[in-house]
Amino acid sequence: MAKKKETPSSLSSSAPQIYEATLGRNGAVVKGQKITQLQAEARRRAGLDVVVCGGNLSANRSFAGAIERNANGNGKRCPPHPNAGMHALPHYQPDPRPPTGHTFYETPNRTAC
């Protein structure tokens, strides 16, 4: 039987949005085009970055974790890496690696640009 896909359990009126992502200067995460959850999972399987944006930290974190687990089977939640730069975002990444890349998510104090 196929594994059931995870989705965010509680969506607020401003549900998180997913975007393609690239890394900018000083750890900044730069938003690209808006994408669907399925597109985000495909990007993550290919080792590319995505970012979950919205005003609800809990929903963003939950959605990012679901994307990473659906794409790669297991995900490790990581704080912003100090060596990445002052604008780095928290994220999920495969554990163990590969593939490369991250599922970033916004917080009230750290956002994608």
Predicted regions mapped to residue ranges:
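Short Lys/Arg-rich cationic patches that frequently serve as NLS/NoLS or arginine-rich RNA/DNA-binding motifs
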Residues: 2-8
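Catalytic toxin/effector domains delivered as secreted proteins or via bacterial secretion systems
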Residues: 15-113
